[in-house]
């Protein structure tokens, strides 16, 4: 495909037009009085959202240079969302302000590389100030306030705070769609995975269609179990001990399954067979997690253990195991606490080293099952469009709350960034680097000004007033009052604010140092074929 090339000012201005098109659509959503954006979908109902990254993802521009500019800003929003779960609109507004000021200085003759270095040094200084001023999140109320700001709904904030209180900071909070109105919170104690009993004959509670085993032995096998002769010696030992048995294996089939079912029906021996969750290496890892949680060993020929030689010392234990046809919950496994802590640390290291979002999510789920618990927030709404929008807001708010616990909180509403600007005066920079730091100083006002504008107030007047207030005091845009924002519950996780600024500065540096853009040449659409009816189509003969 042929390419089209633009150089220096033309290239940078093309990129800036794309950035502005995207940023102007996103920034209307900033703040408590921000508006929504409607996104058309090829299939199904349109989506209504105020989430920056969702809006950014949908924007595709026609002009090749503008398209590249928009794609670069999408990267800012996506990266901020990946790291912190929120702050995508703030990041976009900051990027737009940095690029606008930066390009003005480049056009006036400043050296782009000098500006870039100045911007980087200034951002490092502001980040240092933010982390220093951050307040630790200690109470349930602080978590609720932070989550409520992200979701724009106090009831959602309260529910997330309760969920985090129950499952702990390491626990997983998932959001599901509900067929009813309102919000519900479901808590799962112990480890739950999405595989249930293999046969309905294992059910012990016919009304609830559940199989419940009290204080069972737990056998974990990495392969299929099909022949009964391998299993018999172990079954005899379990029967002698007067216990029930849970078998979790790749599969239980044939005569082995028949024997278990027949003994269950006759009342001779209580057991349940369940397929192991996951596939391949992930299945092995999850079996190992269960082994550590219950104090078992995984029976696998890879480590020289066979089913016929298995004795009770290789089995795990738990206070209770509950199975439905779709899922299994192991409550209070009898594993060694030090071994569990070691496994948790190992999974945490894997999360840090993982490049894949999918792998990271799966590892996070495994971590929660071992370290904390699982809370499910069920969200309902009147229409499908509203339901999707609400579910998305709750997911963002959950990640926002976790970010707050991780690094602490600072005053929200764009105030902290503006009030961090004086720290840049301590930087002893000269020439273009000093200009770069000044660009950051101007850009730090942009989020507050945009929040004020969206609230129907005069941005310049608000910024000047907040600049002269004591640290942490500023405009509460929801009420129009100037007050102590942390006391009023207007807080942002420092991780969100920091990530937004760092990612915006990163992309602004790329914009300023761009000297040429190579893009695909738009293909000319083929001229329509001539009308075979000679222009007289539609005549009725």
Swiss-Prot record:
Provide this UniProt record's keywords sorted from A to Z.
ATP-binding, Cell wall, Chaperone, Isomerase, Nucleotide-binding, Secreted
Annotated localization = Secreted, Capsule; Cell surface; Secreted, Cell wall
Which residues does the annotation say bind ATP? 29-32, 86-90, 413, 476-478, 492
Please provide, alphabetically and separated by semicolons, the GO molecular function terms listed in this UniProt record.
ATP binding; ATP-dependent protein folding chaperone; isomerase activity; unfolded protein binding
Top EC class of this enzyme: isomerase
Q: Which reaction does it catalyse?
A: ATP + H2O + a folded polypeptide = ADP + phosphate + an unfolded polypeptide
Q: Quote any Pfam family the record assigns.
A: Cpn60_TCP1
Q: Note whether ATP-binding occurs among the keywords.
A: yes
Family, as annotated: Belongs to the chaperonin (HSP60) family.
Quote the function comment for this protein: Together with its co-chaperonin GroES, plays an essential role in assisting protein folding. The GroEL-GroES system forms a nano-cage that allows encapsulation of the non-native substrate proteins and provides a physical environment optimized to promote and accelerate protein folding.
Q: Which HAMAP family match?
A: CH60
- Protein name as catalogued: Chaperonin GroEL 2
Q: Which organism is it from?
A: Mycobacterium leprae (strain TN)
Gene label: groEL2
């Amino acid at each position: 495909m042929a390419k089209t090339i633009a150089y220096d000012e033309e290239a940078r201005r093309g990129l800036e037009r794309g950035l502005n098109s995207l940023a102007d659509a996103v920034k209307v959503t900033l703040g408590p009085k921000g508006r929504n954006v409607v996104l058309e979908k090829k299939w199904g109902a349109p989506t209504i959202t105020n989430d920056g990254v969702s809006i950014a993802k949908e924007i595709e521009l026609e002009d090749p240079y503008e398209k590249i500019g928009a794609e670069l800003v999408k990267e800012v929003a996506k990266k901020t969302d990946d790291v912190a779960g929120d702050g995508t609109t703030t990041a976009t507004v900051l990027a737009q302000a940095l690029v606008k000021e930066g390009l003005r200085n480049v056009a006036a003759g400043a050296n782009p590389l000098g500006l870039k270095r100045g911007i980087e040094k200034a951002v490092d200084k502001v980040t240092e100030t933010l982390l220093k001023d951050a307040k630790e999140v200690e109470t349930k109320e602080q978590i609720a306030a932070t989550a409520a700001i992200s979701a724009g709904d106090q009831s959602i904030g309260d529910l997330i705070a309760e969920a985090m209180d129950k499952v702990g900071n390491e626990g997983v909070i998932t959001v599901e769609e509900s067929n009813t109105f309102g919000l519900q919170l479901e808590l799962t104690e112990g480890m739950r995975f999405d595989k249930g009993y293999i046969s309905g004959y294992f059910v012990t509670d016919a009304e609830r269609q559940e199989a419940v085993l009290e204080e069972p032995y737990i056998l974990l096998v990495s392969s299929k179990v099909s022949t009964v002769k391998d299993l018999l010696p172990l079954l005899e030992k379990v029967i002698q001990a007067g216990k029930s048995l849970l078998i979790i294996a790749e599969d239980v089939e044939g005569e082995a399954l028949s024997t278990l079912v027949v003994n269950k029906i006759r009342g001779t021996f209580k057991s349940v067979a369940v397929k192991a969750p996951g596939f391949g290496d992930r299945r092995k890892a999850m079996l190992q997690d269960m082994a550590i949680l219950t104090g078992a060993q995984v029976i696998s020929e890879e480590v020289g253990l066979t089913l016929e030689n298995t004795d009770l010392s290789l089995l795990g234990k738990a206070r209770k195991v509950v199975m439905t046809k779709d899922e299994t919950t192991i409550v209070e496994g009898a594993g060694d606490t030090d071994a569990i802590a070691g496994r948790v640390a190992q999974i945490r290291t894997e999360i840090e080293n993982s490049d894949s979002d999918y792998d990271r999510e799966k590892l996070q789920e495994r971590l929660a099952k071992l370290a904390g618990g699982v809370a499910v927030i069920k969200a309902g709404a009147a229409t499908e469009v509203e339901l999707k929008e609400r579910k998305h807001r709750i997911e963002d708010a959950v990640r926002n709350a976790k970010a707050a616990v991780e690094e602490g909180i600072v005053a929200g509403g764009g105030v902290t960034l503006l009030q961090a600007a004086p720290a840049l005066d301590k930087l002893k920079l000269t020439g273009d680097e000093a200009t770069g730091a000044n660009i950051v100083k101007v850009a730090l006002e942009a989020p507050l000004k945009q929040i004020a504008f969206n609230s129907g107030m005069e941005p310049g007047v608000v910024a000047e007033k907040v600049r002269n207030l004591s640290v942490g005091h500023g405009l509460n845009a929801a009420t129009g009052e100037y007050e102590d924002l942390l006391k009023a519950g207007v807080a942002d996780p420092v991780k969100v604010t920091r990530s937004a600024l760092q990612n915006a500065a990163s992309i602004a540096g790329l914009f300023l140092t761009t000297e040429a853009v190579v893009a695909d040449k738009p293909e000319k659409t083929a001229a329509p074929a001539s009308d075979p009816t000679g222009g007289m189509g539609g005549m009725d003969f």
